[in-house]
């Protein structure tokens, strides 16, 4: 197994670097990576303090630094140490500059400014936490998305991920013996999405859950036939109500959330087209009256 020391140097929170690294490392198997995280590096003095640590654990240095002096100093140190120093976002930034015909603003952490989008995310997170697992159905109309599914279909983590993207998300478990409230069937604003999965996969997940809680795995919660019935019941409910469905069997939380956002966008386009047709019909009718 290969082993790599990876140094992440950022003049902001480092969240961008972490996401880039996570996406890239997913393409490499049998690799052990020791990550060394160096956020908020905004001065020469701070940079000089971390260089000995980089030297003690030589490897790849990945950075996002907008200050030219700090960046040049890091590259110079790495050159002396014989280590590669890679700017994570240069290619994207340069491509955008070329297309937009303007230079990027050299200010660190601009994506974390407390703008309208920031407060929308905060509001979405508060809403989502307060509407987890079927709670607060009287306020579901305020949601952007409502996720429905049987137990252990990643409803809560997907909801939280969507909230961090700025989408108010409620979720509700589908239980055969406990029908959801009527409010679920009367929603007009939120997009209701059904989450489903392969029954055999769900059985394994539930058994692992019971084992982690030191509980009996022989209960109906993880029984093969019972789980198949639950999944079938939920799928029938989704079909009867015309709700779009996402199969989470082989999807990560991020992939499930991306699929949900895509469905929401498609609905917005459809509603926009529907509104355009309605307006045109009204104009035609008005013209006839005249």
Please report, for each region that a protein language model flagged, where it lies by residue.
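N-terminal low-complexity segments that are often proline-rich with Ser/Thr-Pro
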Residues: 11, 270-290
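Ser/Thr/Gly-rich flexible loops in soluble cytosolic domains mediating phosphotransfer, phosphorylation
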Residues: 79-120, 226-230, 236
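A glycine- and Lys/Arg-enriched "phosphate-lid" helix/loop adjacent to the NTP-binding pocket
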Residues: 189-229
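NTP-dependent small-molecule kinase module
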Residues: 237-275
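Metallocofactor- and cofactor-centric catalytic cores in central/energy metabolism, strongly enriched
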Residues: 37-54, 61-65
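Internal active-site segments that recognize and position negatively charged phosphoryl groups
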Residues: 122-169
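N-terminal accessory targeting/assembly segments
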Residues: 1-10, 14-20, 24
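Short beta-strand-centered segment that lines the nucleotide-binding/catalytic pocket of NTP-utilizing
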Residues: 169-180
């Amino acid at each position: 197994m290969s082993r790599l020391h990876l140094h992440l140097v950022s003049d902001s929170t480092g969240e961008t670097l972490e996401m880039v690294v996570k996406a890239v490392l997913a393409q490499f198997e049998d690799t052990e990576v020791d990550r060394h995280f160096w956020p908020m590096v905004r001065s020469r003095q701070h940079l000089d303090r971390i260089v000995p640590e980089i030297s003690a654990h030589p490897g790849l240095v990945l950075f996002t630094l907008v200050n030219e002096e700090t960046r040049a100093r890091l590259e110079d140190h790495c050159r002396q140490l014989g280590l590669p120093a890679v700017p994570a976002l240069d290619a994207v930034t340069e491509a955008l500059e070329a297309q937009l015909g303007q230079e990027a603003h050299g200010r660190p952490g601009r994506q974390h400014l407390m703008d309208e989008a920031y407060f929308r995310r905060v509001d979405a997170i508060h809403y989502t936490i307060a509407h987890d697992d079927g709670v607060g159905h009287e306020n579901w109309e305020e949601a952007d998305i409502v996720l429905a599914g049987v137990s252990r279909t990643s409803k809560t983590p997907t909801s939280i991920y969507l909230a961090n993207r700025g989408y108010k998300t409620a979720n509700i478990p589908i239980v055969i013996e406990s029908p959801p409230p009527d409010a679920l069937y009367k929603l007009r604003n939120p997009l209701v999405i059904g989450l489903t999965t392969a029954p055999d996969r769900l059985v394994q997940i539930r058994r692992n859950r019971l084992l982690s809680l030191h509980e009996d795995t022989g209960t109906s919660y993880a029984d093969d036939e019972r789980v198949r019935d639950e999944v079938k019941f939920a799928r029938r409910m989704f079909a009867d109500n015309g709700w779009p469905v996402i199969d989470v069997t082989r999807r990560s939380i991020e992939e499930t959330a991306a699929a949900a956002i895509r469905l929401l966008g498609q609905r917005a386009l459809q509603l926009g087209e529907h509104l355009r047709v309605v307006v045109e019909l009204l104009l035609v009718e008005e013209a006839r009256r005249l």
